[in-house]
Amino acid sequence: MSRIFSSALQAVFKPSAFLPKTATRSFSILPSLRPATLSSTPSTIFRAPNAITAPSASPSATTGIDGEVLDLLSASSLISSHPALSGLGSQIRCGPRPTMSGATRLVQKRRHGFLSRVKTKNGQKTLKRRLAKGRLRLSA
C-alpha cells in the first residue's frame, strides 16, 4: 500500500506537473514611457503632466517611407523629457568631463604618477611600453 501511495505522490509532485504544458510569454499592455514625437492622444498614465511635452518636429522629418510616424528623438531631448529626470535635465552631461582642469599637481601625481603606475597591472604595462619606446620620463 505504501509503495502505491508513494508512487502516486511522486506522480503528483513531479516538477513537470506544476509547469504549464505550453511555454507562453505574456506581454504587457501598459503604455510605453518612451516619448513619441507626434502623438495624437498622449498617455498620462505613469507620467507627470509637465513631463509630457516633447519637442516639436516637422512632419516630413518624422514620417517614414510608408507614412508611419517614426519615434526619433535626439539623446539630449530623451534625457530631458524623461519623467524621472525632469528636474535634472539641464544638469546631465553626456560627454567627456574636464577632470584635470582644476586639479593640483598633487592630484595629477596621485592619478598619473610613477607609484600609481607601479601599483596596478595596466600601469606596469604602460611603464614597460614607455621604457621600450625610450621615454626619459616614464610617468607624470
UniProtKB/Swiss-Prot annotation:
The keyword Oxidoreductase does not apply. InterPro entries: Ribosomal_bL34 (IPR000271). GO terms for molecular function: structural constituent of ribosome. GO terms for cellular component: mitochondrial large ribosomal subunit. GO terms for biological process: translation. It is found in: Mitochondrion. Belongs to the bacterial ribosomal protein bL34 family. This is Large ribosomal subunit protein bL34m. The lineage of its organism: Eukaryota, Fungi, Dikarya, Ascomycota, Pezizomycotina.
